[in-house]
Amino acid sequence: MTEQTPTPQLPADENSLIAERRAKLGALRGQGIAYPNDFVRTHFAGDLQAEFAEAETWTAEALEAADRSVKLAGRLMAKRVMGKASFAQIQDESGRVQLFLQGNVLGDAYTAFKGWDVGDIVAVEGGLTRTKTGELSVKATALRLLTKSLRPLPDKWHGLSDVEQRYRQRYVDLIVTPEAREVFIKRSKIIRAIRAWLDARRFLEVETPMMHYIPGGATAKPFTTHHNALDLDLYLRVAPELYLKRLVVGGLERVYEINRNFRNEGVSTRHNPEFTMLELYEAYATYHEIMDLTEQVIRDTAQGVLGTTQVSWDGADIDLAPAFRRWRMDEAVRHHNPEISAADCTDRAALLRHCERLKIKVKPSYGWGKLLLEIFESTVEHTLVQPTFITDHPVEVSPLARASDTEPGYTDRFELFINGKELANGFSELNDPEDQAARFQAQVQAKDGGDDEAMHYDADYIRALEYGMAPTGGLGIGIDRLVMLLTGSTSIRDVLLFPYMRPEA
């Protein structure tokens, strides 16, 4: 009966509407308990809609003959008062259902109902029937107000038209925008499906520290905090990688964590300062096996949650069923930049000339590896629409990845791109403690040269590697971006319940 909802009092000042509702709340307080908490529901709206969906089978007569008694509670989303009988619609977490209310049955409760407002939370008890228009309805025998809503909801025609308001007041967005609720329900299912997939393959879920003595595990600028009792500066983690690999050293050969990371960097449609990552490590796996795993977990999650491997994302139709393309970074750069030769890819002077020609800004400290990455990000990344693994990154930009046995200067690393966006990063892990120590030293020099995102030297992690870490493959998947892909969302803020926003003025 949503089409019967009365047009909201648009000309009325919101403050006056709030004042009216506060007056009603005052009257309720005078009558006793204004916010009762003794109602126990037995059913959900969506479950009833599903169970009795067959209108030809479950006619009004059949429903009333079944004599099913139900108790529901939810938010009043629409009401239509017609004198001795009225209709209303309530919404709970599962969906909506119509109420059929009769004055001669409900008595004083019916009189009270006439003064209730859309947005109030109510409880109803009764049997089931079907209206002449075929809509399943609860034929109320009892009706109560549980929570008085003091602020009017946005009208149904315009909803929350201000996108920023949707993010700031997600609680309102979830009430009035079914599509927003569906995104977050899918998000929960996606994470649950990933956990089940990994658990079935003997991966162990673990928890590692959120506050680190030394920021590490990724090239990123950390948030800093201070431990008062210890008088010690700490860092919110940018990645759990080094702790998870310590666990592999300890003999936990398949571990994963789904949790928050924090990076003190910019905000965009793809970046939020805090975000959710899946990070996993598997002993005796190479980056080739980890690519296989990445491909399969994404494909199976899509099929399990959506029932399909074909999705639309930001104007592109993505097919997750075929094998994902695997393409070396230097080959991808040369394909999109025919002027760059194979020899140029490891020649710093040549790459500097190409960056100047392409108007790519670089820093004097960049080596050939960083320059190659800059060219890739500027000229190739945005073209990768269908799922593509970009492999074999330079050592300079991969401080934790194992060096290639066959390609000097490169690593056994990959990143997964879909529709021009990075979704995953993985590699064969560097388990040579002396090589890792040298890479940390290079990162320290880069930091001293002004690179805020370069890593610190982690002596304890080197000590752990000196005990011996099995050959290992690792993976990180950005859960937020994966949810964006599988829900067709174009902004990371659409898949975060409470995205970062500047404080309201």
Curated annotation (Swiss-Prot):
Record-listed E.C. numbers: 6.1.1.6
Record's keyword terms, sorted: Aminoacyl-tRNA synthetase, ATP-binding, Cytoplasm, Ligase, Magnesium, Metal-binding, Nucleotide-binding, Protein biosynthesis
Any Pfam family the entry gives: tRNA_anti-codon
Catalysed reaction equations from the record: tRNA(Lys) + L-lysine + ATP = L-lysyl-tRNA(Lys) + AMP + diphosphate
Gene3D superfamilies per UniProt: Bira Bifunctional Protein, Domain 2 (3.30.930.10), Nucleic acid-binding proteins (2.40.50.140)
PROSITE patterns, per database record: AA_TRNA_LIGASE_II
GO molecular function: ATP binding; lysine-tRNA ligase activity; magnesium ion binding; tRNA binding
Residues that bind Mg(2+) 2: 422
GO cellular component, one term: cytoplasm
Enzyme class: ligase
GO process terms (BP): lysyl-tRNA aminoacylation
Positions bound to Mg(2+) 1: 415, 422
Cofactor comment text: Binds 3 Mg(2+) ions per subunit.
Compartmental location: Cytoplasm
Cofactor(s) in the UniProt record: Mg(2+)
Subunit composition and interactions: Homodimer.
Family (UniProt): Belongs to the class-II aminoacyl-tRNA synthetase family.
Family matches, as HAMAP family: Lys_tRNA_synth_class2 (MF_00252)
Protein name stated in the entry: Lysine--tRNA ligase
